[in-house]
């Protein structure tokens, strides 16, 4: 096992194997996860990757240090579904000339993105390091970060894309190993899964990089006329902008393997001339509701907001931390049956854990057994077995209760005690400042992460008079 792996093993969809995770640069671990397309409130299926990769983000920060992990999760705010929603919701105002389509689109995307942020915060998820919006990366940028138009130009120049019938398409036949992620070769490609077959395509599987916009539709000037990007090129640009041409981990739902992630790989590798886009590809399993596929036609389609704020599921609303635990009780790669019974089980389990954790006045050390379990391809079920054992051993003020409290905080559950050991925090801050002065960043980061696991958020600054580094803290709720 490489020292750089820190004992972490992850299942890689690309290789269909679980192997040691070795970052490209242990001081700059990089992860990209596909975020929401903001045309409608996120549904409970969307919640699963957000929660799963939040746990991985927390684990990576613990293993490599908070300052050494970059997590990018995008917002897709240009899409034909958004256009359709804007016309549906604001059609009369647009027809009356009171609102342009672009203004209506902005209202839809802002409202939906704001709700998404409220939802995921209630689910106990940390904010990603960066959250780029697709519309900010269409045209060449003043800061020189990757953009969609430049990537498309590179693909054309390298012989991997062509213009036809007002579109620019990726030539799948130009990439000999296209289909590597989904294990589909070109002979097996069938139309469907958001890949349209048209007469102007060289190959049935060729997909759109750029398409023309009507005068009313959102559009940007390009060498191929005023238009807008295809679905896949957006993530290739945003990941390259913040993580580089090759990075460590790319995540998302199982439904994105084909065509979205397959086409991301094709675009990025061919535009940059690299052998990979990301070294590890991770995908969470599908979600059913009460044993059936979630579908509006079946009447079992629920948004995160509905579960949190209304009584439409099980005749009651549900706390965000209950939804979080219910999602994590099943291994992320396995399918999950989301049911009232599962939520009730999660709520009862969480109640028992919290009751035991309350026996400790403050969080203790994070048990190595919890980290070991999570380091085995995010085996949350094994980590929860440790928590249940600690709950059984917990007594007033003992180590088991303190370790349980630390574990719950680390996993994103709010059990921070108001009774913080202030002297202990002060000593830890002093030690950290000494380590920073000695340029021992790794140990300084570890102290910060351990305090955060105990519910203590550090804030670094400078004394306005002396200019010396100072650190304040607050209880993170």
UniProtKB/Swiss-Prot annotation:
Listed A to Z, the keywords are: Aminoacyl-tRNA synthetase, ATP-binding, Cytoplasm, Ligase, Metal-binding, Nucleotide-binding, Protein biosynthesis, Zinc
Question: Into which EC class is this enzyme placed?
Answer: ligase
The keyword Ligase is assigned to this record: yes
**Sequence motif 'KMSKS' region, residues:** 293-297
Q: Which GO terms describe its cellular component?
A: cytosol
Q: Where is this motif: 'HIGH' region?
A: 36-46
Positions that bind Zn(2+):
34, 235, 260, 264
Compartments in which it is found: Cytoplasm
Major location (coarse): cytoplasm
Q: Which organism is it from?
A: Mesorhizobium japonicum (strain LMG 29417 / CECT 9101 / MAFF 303099)
Protein name (Swiss-Prot/TrEMBL): Cysteine--tRNA ligase
Q: What cofactor requirement does the entry state? A: Zn(2+)
Note on how the cofactor is bound: Binds 1 zinc ion per subunit.
Q: Which family does it belong to?
A: Belongs to the class-I aminoacyl-tRNA synthetase family.
| InterPro entries with a match to the protein in the record | Cys-tRNA-ligase (IPR015803), Cys-tRNA/MSH_ligase (IPR024909), Rossmann-like_a/b/a_fold (IPR014729), tRNA-synt_1_cat_dom (IPR032678), tRNAsynth_Ia_anticodon-bd (IPR009080)
**Self-association or partners: how does it assemble?**
Monomer.
The record lists the lineage as: Bacteria, Pseudomonadati, Pseudomonadota, Alphaproteobacteria, Hyphomicrobiales
GO function terms (MF aspect): ATP binding; cysteine-tRNA ligase activity; zinc ion binding
* GO terms under biological process: cysteinyl-tRNA aminoacylation
What is this enzyme's catalytic activity, as reactions? tRNA(Cys) + L-cysteine + ATP = L-cysteinyl-tRNA(Cys) + AMP + diphosphate
List of residues binding ATP: 296
Annotated CDD domains: CysRS_core (cd00672)
Highest rank taxon of the organism: Bacteria
EC number per UniProt? 6.1.1.16
Taken from the record, one Pfam family name reads: tRNA-synt_1e
Does the record bear Aminoacyl-tRNA synthetase in its keywords?
yes
């Amino acid at each position: 096992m490489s020292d750089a792996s820190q004992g972490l093993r992850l299942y890689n969809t690309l290789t269909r194997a679980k192997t040691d995770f070795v970052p490209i640069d242990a001081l700059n671990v990089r992860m990209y996860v596909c975020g929401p397309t903001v045309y409608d409130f996120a549904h409970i299926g969307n919640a699963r990757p957000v929660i799963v990769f939040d746990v991985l983000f927390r684990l990576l920060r613990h293993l490599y240090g908070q300052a050494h992990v970059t997590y990018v999760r995008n917002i897709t705010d240009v899409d034909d579904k958004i256009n359709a929603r804007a016309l549906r919701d604001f059609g009369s105002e647009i027809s009356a000339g009171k609102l342009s389509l672009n203004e209506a689109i902005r209202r839809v995307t802002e409202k939906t993105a704001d709700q998404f942020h409220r939802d995921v915060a209630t689910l106990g998820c940390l904010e990603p390091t960066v959250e780029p919006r697709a519309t900010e990366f269409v045209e060449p940028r003043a800061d020189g970060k990757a953009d969609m138009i430049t990537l498309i130009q590179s693909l054309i120049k390298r012989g991997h894309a062509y213009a036809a019938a007002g579109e620019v398409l990726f030539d799948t036949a130009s990439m000999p190993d296209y289909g590597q992620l989904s294990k589909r070769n070109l002979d097996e490609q069938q139309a469907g899964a958001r890949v349209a077959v048209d007469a102007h395509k060289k190959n049935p599987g060729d997909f759109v990089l750029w398409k023309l916009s009507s005068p009313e539709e959102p559009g940007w000037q390009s060498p191929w006329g005023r238009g807008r990007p295809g679905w896949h090129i957006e993530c290739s640009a945003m990941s390259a902008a913040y993580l580089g041409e090759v990075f460590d981990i790319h995540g998302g739902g199982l439904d994105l393997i084909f065509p979205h992630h397959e086409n991301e790989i094709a675009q990025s590798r061919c535009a940059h001339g690299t052998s990979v886009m990301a070294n590890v590809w991770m995908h969470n399993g599908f979600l059913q509701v009460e044993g059936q596929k979630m579908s509006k036609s079946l009447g079992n389609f629920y948004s995160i907001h509905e579960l949190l704020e209304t009584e439409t599921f099980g005749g009651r609303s549900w706390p965000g931390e209950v939804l979080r635990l219910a999602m994590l009780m099943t291994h992320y790669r396995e399918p999950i049956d989301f049911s009232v019974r599962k939520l009730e089980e999660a709520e009862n389990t969480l109640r028992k854990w919290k009751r035991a954790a309350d026996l400790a006045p403050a969080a203790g050390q994070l048990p190595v057994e919890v980290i070991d379990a999570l380091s085995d391809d995010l085996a949350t079920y094994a980590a929860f077995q440790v928590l249940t054992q600690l709950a059984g051993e917990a007594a007033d003020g003992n180590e088991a209760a303190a370790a349980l409290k630390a574990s719950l905080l680390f996993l994103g559950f709010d059990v921070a005690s108001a009774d913080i050991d202030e002297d202990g925090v002060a000593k830890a801050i002093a030690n950290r400042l000494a380590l920073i002065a000695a340029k021992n960043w790794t140990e300084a980061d570890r102290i910060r992460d351990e305090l955060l696991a105990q519910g203590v958020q550090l804030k670094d600054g400078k004394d306005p008079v002396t200019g010396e580094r100072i650190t304040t803290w607050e209880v993170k709720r």
